[in-house]
Amino acid sequence: MENEKTIDALNELIEINNDRVEGYETASSETKSSDLKSLFSELTRTSQNNLSELRAEVNRLGGKPEEGTRVTGKFFRVWMDVKAALTGDDRGAILNSCEFGEDKALEAYEHVFENHTDQLNNEQLDMIRKQQTALRADHDRVKALRDAE
């Protein structure tokens, strides 16, 4: 399939956004803090919007959007750390874990830019840049809250 590498690159981003949705839904259900619940809901929406765009593009290219998450290691453990931190309701630890997760999401987008730009057209690159900008804004919100603790 001529679009296979493009679909693979887009599916990498789908996986990281699936991770993010799963992680923040877990975090939101576990915390008692209403401001964190609200934040996690907004962060989940960012990834849901990203997923909608990415899945539509994979479908347009004739591929099958990834449904799973990256259970290969680091990112999955981050969310387990978030859950453990939430059990103790330690805002600083929660936000620290969330910032680490945000770093991983940004790294996934950077990886696509560094390794797959020749497989993506201008519209796809623009979509991914826009998503990366939104994720960076989310990262900065989490970091600012963490720094304020």
Describe each PLM feature range.
Residues 9-29, 77-120, 124-127:
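Acidic/histidine-rich alpha-helical segments that form the ligand environment
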Residues 5-13, 34-52, 94-98, 123-134:
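Alpha-helical scaffold segments that form or flank carboxylate-/histidine-based iron centers
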Residues 21, 51, 55-58, 79, ...:
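A structural signal for well-ordered alpha-helices, especially hydrophobic packing surfaces
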Residues 35-73, 142-145:
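Conserved alpha-helical segments that form or flank metal/cofactor-binding pockets of metalloenzymes
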